[in-house]
């Protein structure tokens, strides 16, 4: 029995220390990047995206198509959709905000000595080191669109274009920004 208690206490102390070491976004090490990528994706972003998908499903069931009138191109054009999906989209926005607030790593890592490959140079020139922050901004902008907050959505998509100019998500941001301007 005393041996088991010692093992359990050791595991508790070890898990506590690993959480304390990993939880800081002030340091940019491989361990912190992997920890925050993992927790941001599989905890917060996943739940926000699931809430967003639930809202989309509600929007599709809410809209009644009148085939004698001009049909809407996008679901978020209908005022009834805004109130129907408000709670799900608010939760998606809250989750995306949590990813950005608690898991964003903007601190630069220590630069290795010696010659660097172009891939290494591109890595050190990044402004954001968490892979899910740009996706969270995109999720937030889309959720604003379905809430009918087109100005906030446009501002979010503009932020994506300014903050992530070299990422592939900028193209999706441009498309959704154009959609926000149309509304």
Each model region followed by its residue ranges:
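Acidic, polar-rich low-complexity tracts and alpha-helical solenoid repeat scaffolds
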Residues: 2-3, 22-183
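Bacterial N-terminal signal peptides that target proteins for export
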Residues: 2-12
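Bacterial N-terminal signal peptides
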Residues: 10-20
């Amino acid at each position: 029995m005393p041996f088991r208690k010692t093992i359990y206490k050791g595991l508790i102390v070890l898990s506590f220390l690993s959480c304390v070491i990993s939880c800081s976004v002030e340091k940019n090490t491989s361990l912190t990047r992997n920890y925050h990528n993992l927790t941001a994706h599989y905890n917060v972003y996943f739940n926000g995206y699931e809430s967003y998908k639930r809202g989309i499903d509600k929007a599709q069931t809410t809209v009644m198509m009148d085939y004698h009138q001009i049909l809407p191109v996008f679901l978020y054009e209908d005022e009834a959709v805004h109130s129907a999906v408000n709670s799900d989209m608010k939760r998606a926005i809250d989750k995306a905000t949590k990813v950005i607030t608690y898991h964003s790593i903007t601190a630069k890592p220590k630069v290795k000595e010696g010659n660097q490959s172009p891939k290494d140079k591109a890595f050190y020139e990044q402004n954001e080191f968490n892979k899910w922050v740009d996706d969270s901004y995109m999720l937030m902008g889309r959720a604003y669109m379905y809430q009918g907050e087109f100005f906030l959505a446009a501002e979010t998509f503009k932020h994506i274009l300014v903050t992530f100019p070299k990422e592939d998500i900028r193209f999706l941001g441009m498309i959704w920004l154009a959609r926000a301007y149309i509304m």
